[in-house]
Amino acid sequence: MKPVWLTVDTDDLRHVPKSQGHPTRSRGISQQGTSKQMLEAMRSFDTWLDKTQVSLTMFVIADQIDDPVFAQWLKGLLARHPQITVGCHGLTHKCWSAFPEDQDGLLAALVEADIKLHQFAGKAWRPWFRAPAGYIAPWMAPVIAKAGFELDSSVNPSWLVRRKAGPWRDWNAVQSALKDSGLVSRPWLCRLSLPTCGPALSIPFLAWNARRAWKRLGPFVNPYEAEDTVYWQLLDHGRKKGLWKPPLMLD
């Protein structure tokens, strides 16, 4: 068993790259506000968290705070679960490394997101960043640090998704840039050089591989004590008629 940092990304359907934030994949936002699927997932996540009482970090997109339905739900969740912390998943869900380098644009977005999320989350806020959809290039590292963040958890160090690592497609270059910028890096867990987090939890074979990796995880700790980091999507809790849960040794 290995100490692990549990994290959850709160993207709604309107945030996925096929809807927004990618120069070639996005086809337009399908809906505004909290989707029906997200509402169902939120209810199931509430039930799961009330039962397990685990400590985890939620990486929130700052524009979600503008949605009163989501904001009220998250505020209530944080009040009931003081063990939950909040990190930044961007101002919007823009996949920055898929676009030409724009340090000024990224800095402005990160500062605005930091202020917005910090004011909302209060004591639960942490200066931790996760790039939308895991798109992070080396040029982004010093900007993330300049915006006041201390830890980054964007790297998915698998060859299968190296296109997200900027023009060099090199995760080692991203990791080196994070280190040189003074940022603590917490990459996501891989097994057999394959992803085990996020979408990998529901893709055939990758899901089998992920379950094999996750069953060896625990206890659940903060990122500075963790040997591994995993994440899943809040939307996942709407799967299997609301009965889905992460493949952790909790029961």
Predicted feature descriptions by range:
Residues 13-18, 95-96, 195:
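Short acidic/His/Gly/Ser-rich catalytic and metal-binding motifs that mark active-site loops
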Residues 32-40, 104-108, 205-208:
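Conserved phosphate-coordination/catalytic loops
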Residues 38-48, 109-117, 140, 213, ...:
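Alpha-helical packing segments of well-folded alpha/beta enzyme cores
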